[in-house]
């Protein structure tokens, strides 16, 4: 196979980074590549598509998914700092590798939007499974800091559950000379922040196998007005856990504190969730099956000692069908994900396509 075609595609995708759920040019480029180089069936949906290698009377279907969206840097500029250009190019390359071959199965290549916000996997899994329910589903992510091309495996939790939790508390504004005449939300919001370590310990009992985190990303109360004691305040937290149920327990505890504190002080509150990701969990039986195939084909593997702390919306698929989420080493000295210096390494394209083709054939 001519891997220079895949490299050229990856570089073309790199030059047109697009926001989550707005991957219009990316989809056009990918579909054009597949039309020109394969005979795969293309099924266009709203904001996403899948390409199908169909065989008559095939007894099973294997699905492989890639994400397409870019991220923003601190200046609001879009760039492919997570390597989704590479993931999409790998999946298109897999389509090219399978062209004209008889596999004894159908293979569905899913090009998914909106991974960075967690919206894409939830929507696409629901829409895809209404039409086509795979017997096994694969996903992967490049991992800087690990040997190039090494397949990274982990049973049970591979990537953390996470969500963004926002609280808005409304009290009563007053003159700073008479703060007792008002209700400033700063005290309740501070009480919640200071209680977080104890809440976490109460849930996990200090078990290192039950990582649970709450990171304050923003706290804002009032304005820089030295004559006004604030009447409104907001607190934004990122909750993250190895186990989704632990994260949801912590969320309930925080909301209970907000409810109780507001009732006590005569204030009101509201909350919202953003960027909700489930935990990405590999069933042990699926992990053993994949590991056996990789070992039989003498492909390099490494077992991760702990889950990735970041989140990945492939977990939505794994809640519904058997499957496996893999890491692919991007190089031990490669720049980290979401950093300014990061770019997907083209040297990973060939080994990644080989890994996926091997698994698709053997599963």
Language model regions located:
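Acidic/His- and Gly-rich active-site-bordering loop/insert found
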Residues: 1-81, 86-103, 108
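N-terminal hydrophobic/helix-forming segments and targeting peptides
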Residues: 1-17, 100-101, 125, 167-172, ...
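Divalent metal-coordination and catalytic microenvironments
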Residues: 13, 64, 84, 109, ...
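Histidine/acidic-residue-rich, glycine-tolerant segments that coordinate divalent metal ions
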Residues: 49-52, 70-81, 85-86, 101-218, ...
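Non-cysteine beta-strand/loop elements that form the S-adenosyl-L-methionine
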Residues: 63-65, 165-167, 325-331
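Structural signature of FAD isoalloxazine-binding scaffolds in flavoprotein oxidoreductases
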Residues: 65, 139, 232
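Alpha-helix C-terminal capping segments
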Residues: 95-102, 130-131, 318-320
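Metal-dependent amide/peptide-bond hydrolase catalytic core
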Residues: 190-363
